[in-house]
Amino acid sequence: MYKNLKEVLTEAERINYTVGAFNAHNLEMVPDMIRAAKDAGSPIIIQTSVSTARYVGMKNFVAVCKTMANDLLVDVVLHLDHAKSFDDIKEAIDMGYSSVMFDGSSLPLRENIEKALRVVEYAHARNVSVECEIGTIGGTEEGVTVAEGVYTDPKQAIEFLKAVDVDALAVGVGTHHGQFQSKTELNFPLIEELHSLITKPLVIHGGTGVNEADYARLTENGIRKFNVGTELLVAWTRAAKHQFEETELNNSLRNNIMPCNEAVYDVVYHKTGLFLNKEHLTVGAK
């Protein structure tokens, strides 16, 4: 079914697992992402940046996600990631996205609260979920670089949540956007403190750089949404580079693109198995 974020994270909280949120960098990769989640036995969050949503067309993402959710009988959330503008968020909601993120993390706390309240009011009236962020994630995403991340201040997080009824909260705990050649040192004492103080589902951004050995500990400490973007981009691009370098110029474009999407399938299937603690899952079980 096509669901909102709150619905799938409530179930994840009840059973104690984490849901993978995978960034779609084009429309081509989305069907294989959803098939991978179906085969792994998990819901999936397909998320897009604002710029990717505009490149592909929001209605196109909505149509594919709704169709495949119904055809494959798998729970799919379509989420707008790191939106800073109310107009962008409103457009996504009006086009049919089931979840949005308002990122006011760079704003003073009071301004973040005021703008988040407006988003929540509009979204919840339309059964759309809202994620917000306290603290910042370092690294580069969509051409925007944040030199250093800022750890989430637990007191600010509590103050924010007292004022704003968000459905999930992204926290700064040491991860970085765009990191794939090294691994992140997570601040587990902070994660544990946040989990002890906050009842809302917590979200990890910049998940590609997180050591897979840490996944289970993150789940036990309330991480219910785990974002993966760069790893999918690298897998798809690496496969594309190989295909276009090794095949003739008149090779079917379909035959060149399919291995790229299969590489994305493998990443989503593998990660989803780890998020579910299903160690028997293996890459490529299609």
Predicted ranges, named:
Residues 55:
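Cofactor-binding active-site loop characterized by glycine-rich and histidine/acidic residues
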Residues 3-15, 26-51, 59-75, 82-200, ...:
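Alpha/beta enzyme core
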Residues 18, 104, 252-256:
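Short amphipathic alpha-helical segments at helix-loop
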Residues 204-206:
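Thr-Gly-centered strand-to-loop micro-motif
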Residues 241-286:
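Extended, intrinsically disordered, low-complexity segments
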